[in-house]
Amino acid sequence: MKRDKLYEDILRPLLFTLEPEDAHELVHGMMRRFGGMLATFPYRYTGTDLRTNVAGTVFDNPVGLAAGFDKNADLIGVLRHVGFGFAEVGSITARASQGNPRPRLFRLAEDQALINRLGLNGEGAAAVAKRLSSIHASLPIAVNIAKTHDPAIAGDAAVEDILTSFRAIKHLDLSYVALNVSCPNTREGCMKERQELSIILSEMQKLNERGLPLFVKISPDSSDELIYDVVQVATECRLSGYICGNTTVTRDGLTTHANKLAEIGAGGLSGPPLTKLALSTCKKIAGLKAPAQNVIAVGGIRSGADAYRFIRAGASAIELYTGLIFVGPSLPKLICDELSELLRHDGITLEQAIGADLK
C-alpha cells in the first residue's frame, strides 16, 4: 500500500513531539477550523464499486471512523473530505464526564499502537444530540451509547442512564445506534449478564418508534460463551447487527519493553497487535448471527488487505482509529484503493466477498 509521505515524514514527527492527547486535541481543532480545505486534497475515493448496504443505509464505501475519535460530533461536517464512508460518534453518556485523570492516552511507537484509559469523557448526550440536530452531516452518521462512568449507577439506574441517552438521539436521522457493552476503561467494566443486556435492549426497542437500526458492540476479550449469549440476546431483541470489537486489555505480542508497559499501567490496547484477536472474534460473531444482521469490524485495520480479511470473515464494513494516528488522513482512501484492487484481482464484488471465508 502507498505511503502518505507528507504525514509520515513531516506532520507525524511534529505531532509526536506532543503528548498524545494534546496532539489529538490539536488535530481536532485544526479540522474544525480548516476542515473545508480538506476537500482540496485527493483523500476521497470516487469509485462506485465499494458501496455497501448496512442495515438499510448505503455507504459510499465500507471504511468508517470508529467511536472514540469524534466523541462529541465536532467533525461530522468534514469527515467525508477525509474519505470515510460513514462515522460513528461517541461513546456518548447520559451525563457529561471528565473521564479518568491524565495522562490517559499513550503511544507504543514500536508497535504502532495506542493504550488508552480515557474513561468515557464527553459533553453528554443532550449536548451531542443538539449538535447533531443543528449541523448538516457530510456522510452517514451513527451514535455509540455507553453507561455514564460512575460505579454508583447500577441495576435499574444503569438501565435508565442508557435509556436517557437513547431518548436524546432517537429522533435523529442516524444510520444506526450502537450500545457499547465493552468499555475496558471504567471501574465497572462491561455488562456481562445476559439478563441485564436483554432488559436494556428490550427497553431500547420499546422506545424505538422510528425503527432505528440497533447494534451492540462486543469486546474482543469476550469468551465464546459470552459471545454466544450476546448474539442470542441481540437476535431475540431484533437487533440489526454488531460492532466487533473494542480495545483489548491483553498485552500479547508486543515489542514495547515490559518496563514501559508497567509504567503505563491499565488501559485498552488498540492497533496492529489487536488484529488477530479482532479477526477471530469477527469470524465467531459472523458464524452465529442471523442472516439479516450485519457485522462492522474494528481492530488494528490499517490496509486494504486487512480490510479484505475482515470482510471475507463476515464484516459488511470496517472502522479505523489508531491507524489514522500512525498512517495519516489518507488512510481511508488508501484502504479503498487497495481493497478495490484486491476485489478486481479475485473477480468478485464487495457483496460477494462478505463472509466468503465462512462458506
Where are these regions (language model features)?
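Glycine/Thr-rich beta-alpha phosphate-binding loop at enzyme active sites
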Residues: 28, 32-45, 181-196, 233-291
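Glycine-rich beta-to-alpha transition loops that act as phosphate-gripper elements at the mouths
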Residues: 67-70, 144-147, 218-224, 294-305
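Catalytic cores of alpha/beta
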Residues: 72-81, 222-236, 286-287, 291, ...
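A gly/proline- and charged-residue-enriched helix-loop-helix capping module
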Residues: 90-140
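Active-site-adjacent beta->alpha loops and helix N-cap segments on the catalytic face
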Residues: 95-104, 125-126, 133-134, 185-210, ...
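C-terminal helical cap(s) of enzyme catalytic domains, especially alpha/beta-barrels
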Residues: 99-112, 252-267, 324-348
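Active-site glycine- and acidic-residue-rich loops that bind
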Residues: 149-163, 190, 216-236
